[in-house]
Amino acid sequence: IPVLAPQFIAQYAPAVNEQDVGIFVSQSGETKDVLNALERAQAAGMTCFSMANVIGSTLTKQTTAWLPLTCGYEISVPATKTFTNQVITFLNLANLLGGGDGRALEGLPDLMEETLAMCEPQVRVLAEEINAWNDFYCLGYGATLPMALEGALKLKEITYAHCEGMLS
């Protein structure tokens, strides 16, 4: 169940136990809300793993094991490198847990390059067209909802425009 750390504390922490597993995700490994959720989960006996970009962070030290993102120091607020690596790491983990051989993502770099090249002209046209707008809504449903939420956050952080991600 993907959940925001404060929501986990309020809604799910009272119900977890030693038969549950949690993966706690933080770019820095120092996000207070995530560390608070981790503390509650561990107090309930949950097995806790983490995914972080900073080796030796509080989060990585306090979990049973951690998945390193190794995408380098994040200098921009939107944390695009970290987010991209988090998605790829989760895809790889899901593939392996589902019985895959770990090679499912081998073609991903080429696919990403093709997608960027194919979309670049349309993205430039769209950016030019909506550049003066002040309000944006990114809508998603099901598996695309997290992308809509993250897309809205990226637009807010980079453009300072009003943008909301929401369920369609």
Please provide the spans of the model-predicted regions.
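Active-site phosphate/pyrophosphate-binding segments
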Residues: A65-S168
